Amino acid sequence: MKFYSNGKILITGEYFVLNGALSLAVPTVYGQYLEISDNDSNIINWTSYNKNKQIWFKCELDKDSLKVKYSSSKEVSEIIKELISFIREKESNFLKSNGSIINTELTFDKDWGLGSSSTLINNLSKFSGVNPYELNTKFFNGSGYDIACADSSSSLLYRLNDNKKEIKQINFNPSFRDKLHFIYLNKKQNSLDEIKSFREKINSKIGITEISDITKRIILCKDQLEFNSLIKEHENIVSKLTSKEKVKDKLFNDFDGEIKSLGAWGGDFILASALDKNPTDYFKSKGFNTVLNYNELALV
């Protein structure tokens, strides 16, 4: 059996989606495959491949006890053991055949922060029947927007309302999308650490109304100058409330247009809205060589 889940990009609502802000999320054209087959080895053979079809992780677990017989990474194998154990609490026969071969394959660079964990969780959920949001909450305590993107065929609005998930698929495909680019900052952020830090520092009610209002205005936006004004306003709010420096001020203060951080600030991808020419050469001159136009990354 083979399963696939989309990666994700959070356009608005980073951090504040955790506390109930209405947020705009976009599934990506990249994702992760999970293929499972049985054998007679009494072993769970797990192999993970990167986008170049090279092995980046491998382990062997006893199918019953989940004792690690071999692992190329103790940290990763412990996470996999915990995932399997938790799923077995809900579905006792999960991976209890005579043995299993499990292969995962990313179609994006695993350092890009597009959801290597959420796509894995969603794929395991499809196979096991266990609720993916329950798995996600147990292991990552995130908002769940990434799980919503995993099976979505379009952009979506996402909100947590009294811990209930409100998801609405929308068509976010702005007419000026040829002026929008995603740039990788050559650094992967630790989502778990960022979530923990935010929850400890920020009052649960602060910023929700303002961020939600910007999201509503962005999805209706027809004009690039208005869009730029809105993402600038979004950056100002997040910067003020989290005491984090805006990425444009820090790295790109001479950029002709506006820039918005996506997800945890300081790494992964940013969104650039260029007023004039294609900004690829500009970002490459600054040392950032991964520049994708909107349609190259967003599933539209």
Where do the language-model regions lie?
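C-terminal nucleotide
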Residues: F3-N6, L10, V17, A25-V26, ...
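DPxDG-like acidic metal-binding loop motif
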Residues: D111-Y133
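Acidic, glycine-rich active-site loops and adjacent beta-strand->loop/helix elements
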Residues: L106-K110
